[in-house]
From Swiss-Prot:
Free-text tissue specificity from the UniProt record: Detected in the thoracic perisympathetic organs in larvae, and the dorsal ganglionic sheath in adults (at protein level).
An individual GO BP term: neuropeptide signaling pathway
Origin species: Lucilia cuprina (Green bottle fly)
Protein name in UniProt: FMRFamide-3
Example of a GO cellular component annotation carried by this entry: extracellular region
Record field: transmembrane: none
Location relative to the cell: Secreted
UniProt keyword terms in alphabetical order: Amidation, Neuropeptide, Secreted
Protein's UniProt keywords contain Secreted: yes
In-chain residues carrying the UniProt-annotated modification Phenylalanine amide: F11
Keyword Ligase: no
Length: 11
């Protein structure tokens, strides 16, 4: 995961 923001968007 590049950035946490994107990670949260995934879920």
């Amino acid at each position: 995961s590049a950035n946490t923001k994107n990670d949260f968007m995934r879920f």
